[in-house]
């Protein structure tokens, strides 16, 4: 019971490391020239405009914006860590050091919210923290039930465990910097549903809900400045209509509508949350091209779906028209048309592609065994893998290695060949998400690979997170083998007056708010329980000290908690 429940790994992804062996092989760098040139988009600097708008680019994956007011300033998007926010503000404050009156989150992603505590704690008078009404819920999802898998896949996509020399950029920024600095998320204290018009420090500000890259996305419109802050709904690369780290379905039609709302305002300035700013006629032209690219992919996917084509087929059939694809704003340095097509299909029809062969397919091990028989045996299948790697037919090599690994055949040799294939593809990938994901996956196949250690979570961060999320996580952490035949009800009575109850039965954990027929009644504070579950406190010592009062059932309570550990 001494180990942490590790509820918050995504928050603490490490930045690129210089300590590992460089995975990249010698290749013709001409292949990567366009991606290398794309890094110029993230040259570190603050762009300042005469109207009091300032955009910090290149200090991390996301931009941060300062708007000067009469007696104070407004921060739009707060960077991905306290340290990064501090660096950005060291430049902002040289321009104008008036107090921060408000922090606005354009959406829930950590690179826009996790540096907020730095600005929040600068002065005794605390600023407003403004966001869409659903943002805090989505922040908690980042740290919630899918945290382990999203954390791992995010680490791969952003290359956080790769040597710094392998990460050319991450498509919408130079790198993901959440790592060595404390996380400083502050829960919003002003929220809205559809729109909010407010004057802050003499600045008229209009906020509009604008679903797109996230469902909680908003954009900021400054009518007197004619300035638009679109959040992550537009940046200088094809959008992530689907992200390979994993995400709920992104409503592409709503994304287009949000961009049309922005276009209707006819802005003179565009200050995005990723990549460089635009001004003048280029703003409206770019917004139009961007929305047209998204609509084209959506509409043509639907057209081909209705003709009976599968996601894989459609992903190879759709190409942007030349008048759209010529724009630098739809180069595939983040999202791709191919991945977007599959996500759109899944969003409308779900995972089943309509082919009966795929409704209840053979298990992978059974398929691999039959493939080996067709090949003349497992050794012949292995020889085919060797030949595929030698001939640089690497995607076929990956498919063959899948089958050999399913058969547990020559595991070490198969993994080595698989690693070579993954690395070959990754080294030559122009899309940073694909490149980093492949090179990270190759790194994980090293015999001495160890996942980066987690940095400790803080009490300050936990205080911003709802206790409900912890109980949701406990529900999905239940180990069914440990819960066989168990019927038990544990009630939690918090000093806030809140009641939570977990009932174990049929190898599930039901969470409710009923304090009846309790086998164990636990009395404590929400914060203490959160700290114990997250590893800030040692659970055993916290129970032994009485900070978690179990009514004399310490051993039974610790045994109960053990059922939620692997």
Predicted regions and their residues:
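C-terminal motif of bacterial Sec signal peptides marking the signal peptidase cleavage site
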Residues: 13-15
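Active-site metal-binding motif and surrounding structural segment of the metallo-beta-lactamase
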Residues: 41, 46, 71-72, 83-130, ...
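Conserved beta-strand hairpin/beta-sheet module of binuclear metal-dependent hydrolase folds
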Residues: 43-96, 219-232
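Metallo-beta-lactamase
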Residues: 48, 73, 80-82, 137-209, 254-266, ...
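Active-site neighborhood of phospho(di)ester-bond hydrolases with catalytic His/Asp-centered motifs
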Residues: 76-78, 99-109, 130-133, 229-231, ...
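Feature captures hydrophobic
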Residues: 387, 393-399, 403-406, 410, ...
């Amino acid at each position: 019971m001494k180990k942490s429940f590790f509820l918050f790994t995504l928050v603490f992804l490490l930045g690129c490391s210089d300590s590992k062996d460089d995975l990249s092989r010698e290749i013709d760098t001409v292949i990567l020239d366009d991606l290398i040139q794309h890094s110029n988009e993230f040259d570190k600097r603050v762009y300042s405009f005469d109207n009091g708008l300032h955009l910090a680019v290149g200090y991390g994956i996301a931009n941060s914006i300062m708007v000067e007011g009469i007696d104070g300033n407004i921060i739009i998007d707060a960077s991905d860590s306290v340290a990064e926010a501090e660096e950005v503000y060291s430049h902002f404050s040289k321009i104008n050091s008036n107090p921060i009156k408000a922090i606005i989150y354009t959406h829930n992603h950590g690179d826009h919210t996790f540096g907020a505590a730095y600005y929040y704690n600068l002065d005794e008078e605390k600023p407003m923290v403004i966001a869409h009404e659903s943002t805090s819920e989505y922040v908690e999802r980042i740290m919630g039930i899918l945290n382990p898998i999203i954390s791992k896949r995010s680490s791969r996509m952003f290359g956080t465990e790769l040597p710094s020399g392998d990460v050319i950029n991450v498509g919408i920024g130079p790198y993901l910097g959440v790592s060595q600095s404390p996380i400083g998320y502050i829960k919003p204290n002003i929220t809205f549903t559809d729109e909010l018009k407010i004057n802050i420090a003499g600045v008229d500000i209009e906020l509009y809900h604008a679903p797109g890259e996230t469902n909680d996305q908003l954009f900021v419109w400054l009518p007197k400045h004619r300035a638009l802050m679109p959040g992550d709904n537009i940046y200088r690369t094809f959008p992530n209509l689907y992200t390979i780290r994993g995400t709920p379905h992104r409503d592409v039609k709503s994304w287009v509508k949000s961009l049309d709302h922005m276009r209707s305002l006819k802005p003179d300035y565009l200050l995005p949350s990723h990549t460089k700013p635009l001004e003048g006629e280029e703003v409206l032209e770019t917004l139009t091209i961007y929305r047209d690219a998204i609509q084209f992919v959506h509409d043509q996917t639907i057209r081909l779906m209705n003709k009976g084509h599968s996601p894989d087929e459609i992903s190879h059939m759709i190409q942007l028209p030349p008048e759209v694809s010529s724009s630098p704003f739809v180069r595939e340095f983040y999202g791709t048309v191919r991945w977007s097509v599959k996500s759109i299909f899944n969003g409308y029809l779900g995972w089943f592609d309509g082919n009966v062969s795929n409704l209840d397919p053979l298990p992978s091990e059974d398929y691999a065994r039959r493939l080996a028989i067709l090949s003349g045996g497992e050794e012949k299948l292995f020889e085919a893998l060797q030949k595929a790697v030698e001939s640089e037919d690497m995607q076929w090599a990956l498919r063959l290695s899948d089958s050999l690994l399913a058969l547990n055949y020559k595991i070490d040799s198969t993994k080595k060949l698989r690693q070579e294939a993954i690395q070959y593809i990754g080294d030559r990938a122009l899309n940073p998400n694909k490149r980093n994901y492949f090179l990270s996956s190759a790194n994980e196949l090293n015999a001495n690979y160890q996942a980066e250690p987690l940095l400790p979570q803080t009490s300050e961060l936990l205080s911003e997170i709802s206790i409900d999320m912890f109980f949701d996580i406990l529900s999905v952490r239940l180990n069914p083998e440990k819960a066989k035949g168990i019927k038990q009800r544990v009630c939690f009575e918090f000093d806030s007056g809140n009641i939570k109850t977990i009932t174990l039965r049929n190898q599930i954990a039901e969470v409710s708010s009923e304090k009846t027929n309790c086998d164990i009644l636990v009395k404590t504070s929400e914060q203490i329980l959160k700290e114990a579950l997250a590893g800030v406190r040692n659970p055993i010592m916290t129970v032994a000290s009485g900070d978690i009062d179990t009514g004399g059932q310490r051993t039974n309570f610790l045994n109960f908690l053990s059922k939620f550990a692997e």
